Design a protein with these regions (language model features):
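Substrate-binding cleft of carbohydrate-active enzyme catalytic domains
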Residues: 166-206
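Acidic, contiguous N-terminal accessory segments
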Residues: 2-168
């Protein structure tokens, strides 16, 4: 086998092999137009981009989604004002991030549409909205995960439409703390990072 050629483990040349080594250029998808992990099922780019300072409110349809809205809208530091006003009700036509219930969406799936006027997120329930907001965060500068969000108003997000749903129902990672110890805060941070990448199972070895 030549250097860099695909090599399947366990069942050579079987497309269902458990693991494959591939050439580095094969790993970078020619389809990737935005930096998102995991990459969505569909990404359609629009024209231009919009600054986050254009949006003044985050509208959510029901009280059970308020905490998701608060987490996205609020600064990480409690001493600062929310970046977006929170409103429960119908979607707004301008300057808003709208969470819109849509029963046609797949379980845990969502549609995220960014235009010059609004960011509309459609999902059939809490999980879909959660994953859509994670994707929206990934479209922003990495500073969105920092202790402050200085420059928020100037941050831009591309105009696009994303349609996505999980390829697998069980998406987990394992942490073995019986061999290498972690503090409670470190474990909580790991869970937060797992959520960024839309993992939904925490396998904990104690």
């Amino acid at each position: 086998i030549s250097l860099g050629a695909p090599l399947a483990l366990y069942y050579k040349n079987d497309p269902n092999a458990v693991m494959q080594f591939v050439k580095e250029e094969d790993m970078a998808s020619a389809q990737a137009q935005v930096k998102l992990i995991p990459y969505p099922q569909s990404v359609v780019m629009g024209e231009g981009e919009v600054a986050m300072g254009h949006f003044t409110s985050l509208v959510y349809p029901s009280e059970e989604l308020r905490d998701l809205a608060e987490t996205f809208a609020n600064h990480p530091t409690a001493s600062t004002q929310p970046l977006l006003a929170l409103e429960q009700g119908a979607p707004k036509a301008d300057a808003a991030i709208n969470l819109i219930l849509d029963n046609t969406q797949a379980d845990e799936g969502y549609e995220l549409k960014v235009t010059a006027n609004t960011i509309d997120i459609k999902a059939n329930g809490r999980a879909g909205f959660f994953y859509a907001l994670q994707s929206l965060r990934q479209l922003l500068p990495v500073a969105v995960y920092g202790a402050t969000r200085e420059g928020w108003a100037e941050w831009t997000v591309p105009c696009l439409t994303i349609k996505d749903r999980p390829a697998f129902g069980h998406r987990g990672f394992m942490l073995d703390v019986s061999r290498h110890f972690f503090t409670k805060e470190e474990v909580k941070k790991l869970i937060d990072v797992a959520a960024i990448y839309k993992l939904n199972r925490f396998h904990w070895h104690l």
